[in-house]
C-alpha cells in the first residue's frame, strides 16, 4: 500500500500563475510508485475541473476525484450532515456555487446581499 500525499496547491504546486519547478515531476513519480496524490486548497473561487485542467497542463497526476477545495468540502459536508437543506444563499465565489449545484442544492445568489450585506437583503430570499 502506498502513501497518501495531501498536497496544497497555492504556494506548493504553483505560485500565482507559475508552477513551482520540479513539483509536477516529483508527484508524477510518486503516483507511478503507487502513492495516491490528492490536492487540497482553501480557495473556493474555482471549480474543481478548473484545478484539474491546470494541474494536467503542468504534467501533474490528476483525476476527477483528486482535487478537494473548500467549496467541494463545504458542499459535501452540507449534503451529508444536513440533508434537509435544499436552498442555499451563496455570498461567495463561482466555485462554491457550482459545487453546491453539483450536490443538488438550489443555489440563490444576490448581488445586493453580497454588496450591502444587510439583514434586509438576506431576508428577501
What do these predicted regions represent?
Residues 1-125:
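HAD-like aspartate-dependent phosphatase fold
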Amino acid at each position: 500500500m502506498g502513501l497518501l500525499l495531501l498536497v496544497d496547491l497555492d504556494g506548493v504546486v504553483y505560485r500565482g500563475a507559475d508552477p513551482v519547478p520540479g513539483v509536477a515531476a516529483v508527484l508524477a513519480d510518486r503516483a507511478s510508485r503507487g502513492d495516491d496524490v490528492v490536492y487540497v486548497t482553501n480557495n473556493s473561487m474555482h471549480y474543481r475541473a478548473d484545478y484539474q485542467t491546470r494541474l494536467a497542463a503542468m504534467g501533474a497526476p490528476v483525476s476527477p476525484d483528486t482535487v478537494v477545495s473548500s467549496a467541494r468540502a463545504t458542499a459535501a459536508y452540507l449534503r451529508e450532515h444536513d440533508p434537509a437543506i435544499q436552498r442555499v444563499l451563496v455570498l461567495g465565489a463561482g466555485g462554491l456555487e457550482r459545487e453546491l449545484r453539483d450536490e443538488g442544492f438550489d443555489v440563490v445568489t444576490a448581488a445586493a446581499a453580497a454588496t450591502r450585506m444587510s439583514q434586509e437583503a438576506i431576508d428577501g430570499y
